[in-house]
């Protein structure tokens, strides 16, 4: 935006410091072969309408999430090729993984109604390669499958359960007379520490960090959690497949995000978010030994999310990305700023 350039805001500073060419829409877009739309879902319709007026003939429009196409039903000019490269993590983590010489698993797709030159898949592959995703894994998918699996993962294990479990585990620790500062750090950094084992060896390695007695206890708790939450996970999946979830979310957009902002404000004012800082180091193994409930919650949530998506027709690879593989990257956001950053990204 011209005012962002004039004010030299943070996004302008970030772009300049990383050697990107910076200019306004009217100057850059008419000459671009590929235009990538990374704005929030709520802004997509307006942004895409503006982009189409500026994009040259036979250019390509890229998405990182297919909500605008699938749930809103956006119609794109027929000469424009429409593709998607959807990294399975927040955008901040895409950059961090690239900087360390790796990448994140990514779904790619082509909008078949906008691929008259049959070049969409090649462009999507090149784009995913450019952000390092080929090092972690690139899976060809579809706009519909990406949207439905992405929403299901976010609403359950990736965001819904991590958020709720953080608050409940903290309340339980405080009720048991634990030091609030220690309890806060155990949970805030515990998710990141524990889920790191998922990256290297899945649920099996995570469970193997426990003693035999603790492993049995975590397993039994996870089975109880699965029985309690199974119907709730299925309802989430049904609402997502039917479009009911997206319909309610778009209604909230029209109401200036009132419901979303109310939820954020409630989280901001929880005792977990306001807990004092614990300055001592917690040994890595202690996160496992004192986090048996957290491990049980992770095991139950991952398995329920994966099984529910699989039973709804989502392919196993996509369900895996959205239930287990993305989890450590979401946990990283809690480690940085508790639930605040996870809710913002």
From Swiss-Prot:
GO terms for biological process: isoleucine biosynthetic process; L-valine biosynthetic process. Binds 2 magnesium ions per subunit. One of its GO terms (cellular component) is cytosol. It comes from the Bacteria. It comes from Buchnera aphidicola subsp. Uroleucon sonchi. Belongs to the ketol-acid reductoisomerase family. Keywords: Amino-acid biosynthesis, Branched-chain amino acid biosynthesis, Magnesium, Metal-binding, NADP, Oxidoreductase, Repeat. The gene is ilvC. It holds the Pfam family KARI_N. Mg(2+) 2 binds at residues 150, 322, 326. Residues 142-286, 287-345 form the KARI C-terminal knotted domain. Its cofactor is Mg(2+). Involved in the biosynthesis of branched-chain amino acids (BCAA). Catalyzes an alkyl-migration followed by a ketol-acid reduction of (S)-2-acetolactate (S2AL) to yield (R)-2,3-dihydroxy-isovalerate. In the isomerase reaction, S2AL is rearranged via a Mg-dependent methyl migration to produce 3-hydroxy-3-methyl-2-ketobutyrate (HMKB). In the reductase reaction, this 2-ketoacid undergoes a metal-dependent reduction by NADPH to yield (R)-2,3-dihydroxy-isovalerate. PANTHER family: KETOL-ACID REDUCTOISOMERASE, MITOCHONDRIAL (PTHR21371:SF1). This is Ketol-acid reductoisomerase (NADP(+)). Its EC number is 1.1.1.86. NADP(+) binds at residues 11, 41-43, 91. The active site is at residue 65. The lineage of its organism: Bacteria, Pseudomonadati, Pseudomonadota, Gammaproteobacteria, Enterobacterales. Residues 1-141 form the KARI N-terminal Rossmann domain. InterPro entries: 6-PGluconate_DH-like_C_sf, 6PGD_dom2, KARI, KARI_C, KARI_N, KARI_prok, NAD(P)-bd_dom_sf. Mg(2+) 1 binds at residues 150, 154. It catalyses: (2R)-2,3-dihydroxy-3-methylbutanoate + NADP(+) = (2S)-2-acetolactate + NADPH + H(+); (2R,3R)-2,3-dihydroxy-3-methylpentanoate + NADP(+) = (S)-2-ethyl-2-hydroxy-3-oxobutanoate + NADPH + H(+).
